[in-house]
Amino acid sequence: TKETVVEQIANLSQVSIVPNCDEYAIEYLPLSELFDTIKGKSKYTKKYGNLHSGPYPVYSASSQGTLTHLDTYDYDGRYMTWSTNGFAGTILILDGKFSINGDRGILVPKNGRQDLDFDYMKFTLEPIFRELAKGRKGDNGEDEFTKLYPSMLNDIMVPIPVDGEGNISLSLQKEIAQKFISVQNSQKEIIEKLDALISKKISI
């Protein structure tokens, strides 16, 4: 039935499919050795944007667009960022000249290191971040409004593929990331086909 297909789409959208990476040698390193975690500036609001209007985007908790635009920027380049409030733990890769407000944090590679692939890191870290945010419980045992501040990331150990000499391998990270992307694309393709069936009102 149509309802069954809709339910299947909803379920499939929530599934995190992880490719088999058993063939790789993995080391676990502290997140704090790989990245500096920095929270955005709370002064960046829509009102602030109206007073300092310009071409450079400011990103907030939402991954669906910008909060405002300023005449200055705090970062220039490609970075991983995460939402600290609301749908906390969701990672968004940003590229260009931009700023973030207090509802988003940024992961800056430690000492300018160049051996980290952001696609691999996003696929690896996002489930860990989301679980950390989801794990917070209120006094009554109910989930609180999720938050994920930099201080909450201190104890994370990151699984990273290493080469035969035990060094972090950028090429293996890229190889694994491509597997993630391939699986994700297949998942997206299935969902689109199911959506098409519904829109055509085909009886199943």
Language model segments and positions:
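Short alpha-helix boundary/capping segments
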Residues: 109-120, 145-148, 165-168, 182
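Non-catalytic DNA-recognition/assembly elements of restriction-modification systems
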Residues: 1-64, 163-204
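A residue-level signal for beta-strand positions that form part of recognition/binding surfaces
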Residues: 28, 55-56, 79, 104, ...
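A short glycine-rich beta-alpha junction/loop motif
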Residues: 15, 98-105, 137-165, 170-171
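Generic recognition of flexible, low-complexity loop/linker segments
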Residues: 44-47, 68-70, 144
